[in-house]
Amino acid sequence: MNKRMNELVALLNRYATEYYTSDNPSVSDSEYDRLYRELVELETAYPEQVLADSPTHRVGGKVLDGFEKYSHQYPLYSLQDAFSCEELDAFDARVRKEVAHPTYICELKIDGLSISLTYEKGILVAGVTRGDGSIGENITENLKRVKDIPLTLPEELDITVRGECYMPRASFDQVNQARQENGEPEFANPRNAAAGTLRQLDTAVVAKRNLATFLYQEASPSTRDSQEKGLKYLEQLGFVVNPKRILAENIDEIWNFIQEVGQERENLPYDIDGVVIKVNDLASQEELGFTVKAPKWAVAYKFPAEEKEAQLLSVDWTVGRTGVVTPTANLTPVQLAGTTVSRATLHNVDYIAEKDIRKDDTVIVYKAGDIIPAVLRVVESKRVSEEKLDIPTNCPSCNSDLLHFEDEVALRCINPRCPAQIMEGLIHFASRDAMNITGLGPSIVEKLFAANLVKDVADIYRLQEEDFLLLEGVKEKSAAKLYQAIQASKENSAEKLLFGLGIRHVGSKVSQLLLQYFHSIENLSQADSEEVASIESLGGVIAKSLQTYFATEGSEILLRELKETGVNLDYKGQTVVADAALSGLTVVLTGKLERLKRSEAKSKLESLGAKVTGSISKKTDLVVVGADAGSKLQKAQELGIQVRDEAWLESL
């Protein structure tokens, strides 16, 4: 029976690839169904012989309890956006300062959900969402139901690949028709539908909705020397790679491709929202490196957003956690990018003056970055009033005088006891990217603050279960869950806490970078600004902001109180040791290692202070080689780069 099951699995997987990947089926649907039923019968009779790559894993029935957090071994960076040819020119100029004659590769920017797929010995072991780039959610069981994702690879590889999971337009129409017939609300757009599907706890629902993928990158150190070769390699492994791409030598060629894609966009069977431009050569990518948030070797050109006219009804002014006062326009409702929009940001007081926005104006609204509704400009031909908007002089929360500093575009409240700032700071502290306290959202924080149960973030850790029962609408079960979530957050790695403190210019990526170097918030609080500014990707502005924050008596008291309540102040990730054996060295791993997994070798190198990259360049200090090292070993020898073997690495 095992032989026949092997034959059926191989046949069905080949036919599925022909159908879903190549769009060139060699058998009829009825023949596929006949073979599939035969396999199901055999697997039912011999469950102990079911193969890992059996197509039956893709259908049917598992109801999941939830999604576990998953730490990405290789961080997923965001991309810098560009909205004009001039911004692409600026990107090209920055690249050419480091790379004399770059070749670019242009790929379609699929409007889906970023995913990371990890294979061990050629078997899919983890499918994860992007999350915040460092930690995502493990949705492996759902991604196994996406029919064009290989469950096994033709080689026994340890590899992590990245791509986009999306819902084709035809599938979107079918899903929405079914929801309409069932009296369920329709999805606004294919991206929302894909996101909602991947969040399903019932995997059978995922299997029915016909999601698809395009893979675009090997995240683990690549064995290829260019992005184009990497894409071809992914195709060889059985992944679906978007064929619509070009190599370009200059911005004119890139711009022509963007214009061509823009004209074809509506006729594609899937949604795109732009074109991604990357330096093709991987060694050049290594030379260019990264900022804290994004690679310097890539940019995402975004197509102009959809625009609609709406009438300005009124303006609300709100205070954020840093004291900035932001105006929000209340508008006549309009349909925009699949959703109803009745509020849009006006950014700041200088923006209102620059655009000369007045009462009752008709304005053009769009979604900035396809996400945030914003007012773009006034339709002056439809102006009905010359009356200017009322600009507040006092804080809408605490009534303190508002200031408008010369070097700032916004009004600002500088009262440290401003209730709105304190409450927004508490909401930020509990948010997903900060301390990630499940259930402690804005509405609960507002109730706690109004009940005078919390005045600063340390108070959160003094709360007891019974305190939550004092809040309207909170029952015993919810109170217990909130208390447990707060206790669990005490164990977070310290970069979550540092970001949660809301220090100006210190975002989540900067927080992680700082803690990798200083290992604890207490060490960081004692560091001098020169030491902070010397860290790669940081600088004087961040160093000064940290120095200002930690110099205050309030910060010292707050850290002491947090520590006393049991909150962890130490970094739990991979640290950088200043005097480690390989501190500051750029190292490339190549070839097949005999005793260590590649991930183990990478972790060891990083623990010794090395930066592990995938391509050899003039910035490479050391190459660790295994069997069949090939062209990378040859290139290292040509460049005179030091070469070591696996035994040497194990001896460190």
Swiss-Prot record:
User: One GO molecular-function annotation for this sequence?
Assistant: DNA binding
The Swiss-Prot or TrEMBL record describes its family as follows:
Belongs to the NAD-dependent DNA ligase family. LigA subfamily.
What does it do?
A: DNA ligase that catalyzes the formation of phosphodiester linkages between 5'-phosphoryl and 3'-hydroxyl groups in double-stranded DNA using NAD as a coenzyme and as the energy source for the reaction. It is essential for DNA replication and repair of damaged DNA.
Q: Which GO terms describe its biological process?
A: DNA repair; DNA replication
Species of provenance: Streptococcus pneumoniae serotype 4 (strain ATCC BAA-334 / TIGR4)
Cofactor needs: Mg(2+); Mn(2+)
Matching InterPro entries:
BRCT_dom, BRCT_dom_sf, DisA/LigA_HHH, DNA_ligase, DNA_ligase_AS, DNA_ligase_CS, DNAligase_adenylation, DNAligase_N
E.C. number: 6.5.1.2
Q: Which gene encodes it?
A: ligA
Q: What is this protein called?
A: DNA ligase
Alphabetical keyword list:
DNA damage, DNA repair, DNA replication, Ligase, Magnesium, Manganese, Metal-binding, NAD, Zinc
Which residues of this UniProt protein bind Zn(2+)? 395, 398, 413, 418
Q: Which positions are annotated as binding NAD(+)?
A: 29-33, 78-79, 107, 130, 164, 278, 302
Q: Which HAMAP family match?
A: DNA_ligase_A
- Active site at 109 (n6-amp-lysine intermediate)
